[in-house]
């Protein structure tokens, strides 16, 4: 795993938080995470990068956070960093013998746990596109349908329901006072906290 490159230091261009809709899309942040050994995660990232609706939600979330509320960014750069941090931590824990929730309770694989963590990280703040207040609950509302659209290309209906439920649990667990009940949810909560404050805090993994 030493040759894997996790992008945990992406920085937004000025265009990412200013300009017309077309300008913002032209300066699109491409989602990526080391996924060559996980075909399911690879497919998920491919679908995410082809989804203009999802990218628009990230842009709207960032406008509310940065331009209207003066907060740190909650858009595509933030979720990309959180995803890379979360997947990296999950792999380190898996290598140390820690069992994921989907493995413990459903006999699913570490690759499935990576899908849970990646999509929870990517969707945890989409509710900011509506409002900061109660954004975690809004994120659940938005993510429910978006996850169905993405996961139907990766899982059969039975497994899709379980994976979607695990992702939604991880999303709601990142709220203040939230209680993660799975390894995956805990990892996403920590990864979100690590990408913090203005200027961002970074943990070097390489």
Where in the sequence are the language-model features?
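Acidic/His-rich, divalent-metal-binding segments that scaffold phosphate/diphosphate chemistry
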Residues: 3-135
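Amphipathic alpha-helical interaction segments
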Residues: 81-84, 121, 138, 166, ...
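Amphipathic alpha-helical interaction surfaces
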Residues: 85-88, 92, 149, 193-196
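Histidine/acidic-rich helix-loop-helix segments that form or flank divalent-metal centers
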Residues: 104-108, 156-206
């Amino acid at each position: 795993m030493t040759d894997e490159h996790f992008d945990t230091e992406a920085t937004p261009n000025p265009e990412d938080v200013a300009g017309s809709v077309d300008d913002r899309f032209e300066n699109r942040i491409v989602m990526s995470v080391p996924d060559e050994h996980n075909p399911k995660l690879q497919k998920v990232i491919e679908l995410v990068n082809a989804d203009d609706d999802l990218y628009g939600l990230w842009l709207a979330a960032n406008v509310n956070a940065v331009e209207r509320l003066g907060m740190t960014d909650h858009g595509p750069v933030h979720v990309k960093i959180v995803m890379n941090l979360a997947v990296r931590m999950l792999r380190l824990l898996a290598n140390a013998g820690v069992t994921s929730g989907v493995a413990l309770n459903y006999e699913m694989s570490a690759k499935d746990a990576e899908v849970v963590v990646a999509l929870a990280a990517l969707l945890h703040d989409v509710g900011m596109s509506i409002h900061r207040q109660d954004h975690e609950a809004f994120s659940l509302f938005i993510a429910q349908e978006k996850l169905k659209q993405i996961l139907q290309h990766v899982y059969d209906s039975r497994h899709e329901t379980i994976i979607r439920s695990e992702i939604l649990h991880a999303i709601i667990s990142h709220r203040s006072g939230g209680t993660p009940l799975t390894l995956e949810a805990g990892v996403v909560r920590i990864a979100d906290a690590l990408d913090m404050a203005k200027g961002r805090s970074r943990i070097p993994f390489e």
